[in-house]
Design a protein with these regions (language model features):
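Sequence-level detector for compositionally biased, low-complexity segments
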Residues: 1-218
């Protein structure tokens, strides 16, 4: 059950000129049939146009907040404040609310690794032998060329074509693309592990693109 301050919800209703629905987050997901909640559309002049909803649900508000918190300009503007207190999210504006809801929903789907587009192959394996992470994965164990990273797992096998943007991407205080591998030093990776890692890399790349789109909307 969403734990919202209803006084704030009433202010948001006024800001958007919309009523707040009574679906829980789970009901929102169930009624949408998936992770990402689709917005209503109508064909006008041969093209699909997003239509405004008559009310917003808890998940819509969650996705709006999630989008704002992933805005690079928002993070830069409030970075000192965010170090000492909870984030302050601006009240939504009618002209941008649903765009941010859509982008936030896409981010949520990516970060839950449920987006089907994440299966697109990005990384490759170079060399022959078992995928034993023998090296400590320090700077000497990887090289960068044409914005792509080659990571040497051991003397025989490397992971190649890791996009630099994903390799250097931070979430919180760590870099997922690097931490995931470092946490597995000494282990032999299998096909399922590499498929999962490819999905992580894909999610990080797509997150970077969506964050830029969020800034364009804000």
């Amino acid at each position: 059950v969403p734990n919202f301050n209803m006084d704030i919800i009433k202010d948001i209703e006024k800001s958007l000129n919309l009523n707040f629905g009574n679906w829980t987050l789970v009901q929102s997901l169930e009624n949408s049939g998936g992770t990402e909640v689709p917005l209503p559309k109508e064909k006008i002049g041969g093209s699909e146009v997003l239509l405004p909803k008559k009310e917003f649900q808890a998940l819509d508000l969650f996705d709006y907040i999630y989008a704002v918190l992933h805005s690079p300009s928002y993070r830069e503007k409030y970075k000192e404040f965010l170090k000492i207190d909870f984030p302050r999210v601006p009240y939504p504006k009618p002209e941008t609310f649903w765009q941010l809801v859509s982008l936030g929903g896409k981010l949520r789907s990516l970060h839950l690794l449920e987006d089907t587009s994440l299966d697109e192959r990005i990384i490759d394996i170079k060399g022959e032998g078992e995928l034993l992470i023998k090296n400590s994965l320090n700077k000497k164990d990887f090289s960068i060329e044409d914005e792509k990273v080659e990571l040497r797992l051991n003397d025989e096998v490397s992971v190649v074509n890791i996009p630099l943007v994903a390799w250097e991407f931070y979430i919180g205080g760590y870099q997922p693309a690097q931490k995931w591998l470092k946490d597995r030093v000494g282990r032999v990776l299998n096909r399922a592990d590499m498929k999962h890692y490819n999905r992580i890399i894909n999610a990080l790349c797509k997150t970077d693109l969506i964050m830029k789109k969020i800034d364009e909307v804000l």
